[in-house]
Curated annotation (Swiss-Prot):
Belongs to the universal ribosomal protein uL30 family. Signal peptide: none annotated. Disulfide bonds: none annotated. One of its GO terms (molecular function) is structural constituent of ribosome. The lineage of its organism: Bacteria, Pseudomonadati, Pseudomonadota, Betaproteobacteria, Rhodocyclales. This is Large ribosomal subunit protein uL30. The keyword ATP-binding does not apply. It comes from Dechloromonas aromatica (strain RCB). It holds the Pfam family Ribosomal_L30. The gene is rpmD. One of its GO terms (biological process) is translation.
Length: 60
């Protein structure tokens, strides 16, 4: 059975954000603006996305 995946895209710059928010974005596998990452939908990933929801766009 395939695990559900979600696509996360960085849509706002991390300049001027808190250090732990920058670390969370890096942990999601995002580097540059408009970079995307496909991640397995787990509670840990959902929590990371919720923490930086003002910086990212989520699909799927």
């Amino acid at each position: 059975m395939a695990d559900k995946k979600i696509k996360v895209t960085l849509v706002k710059s991390v300049i001027g954000t808190k250090q732990d928010h920058r670390a969370t974005v890096k942990g999601l596998g995002l580097r540059k603006l408009n970079s995307s990452s496909e991640l397995i939908d787990t509670p840990a990933v959902r929590g990371m996305i919720q923490k930086v929801q003002y910086l990212v766009k989520v699909e799927g």
